Amino acid sequence: MHKRSLGGLALATVVTIAAGAPLAAQRLRAVEAGVGGALTVARHTMAGVEVGAGYRPGGQSRIALALDAGSEDGQAAARAQLTAQFLVTPNARRGTGVYGGIGVAVAGRRRSPGRGYLALLLGLEAAPGRRGGWYAELGLAGGARLAAGWRGRWFQP
């Protein structure tokens, strides 16, 4: 009886380890780059272009940096946002993926001091498990922010 228990335990251990290997292989790591437009509506409205970069270490997380440059009340303005994001379906190769994020943002314009904010966002993106596609974000960071564009992804083994 004792040998059977040990044999069953060994078999269960092997099955558990073997089942975990495909799961680890499905964890997509990626480097991302994007370009688009951004609009921030607050006391002053800023409209401009956005460039972004992101890193997905695997699982459901992404670290993203977005840099916006444009115009606010006729003055040159810039904005930077760094967020930690949670992707609901990071491996989806079809359909739309949903993600949310929290982080920090800093915004400034010519002849005016910069301002720092807590940043919250909710986003949609085309098939996050594919090499690229559109994205759209709605966020709060010193006002309402809308951004949309195209994001490319380079997956790593």
Segments (PLM) and residue ranges:
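Cleavable N-terminal export/targeting peptides
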Residues: M1-L28, P157
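Glycine-centered flexibility sites
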Residues: G36, G48, G101-A105, G123, ...
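Residues that cap or initiate secondary-structure elements
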Residues: V41, P90-A92, G108-R110, G142, ...
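Predominantly the C-terminal beta-signal and adjacent terminal strand-loop region
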Residues: Q60-I63, R115-P157
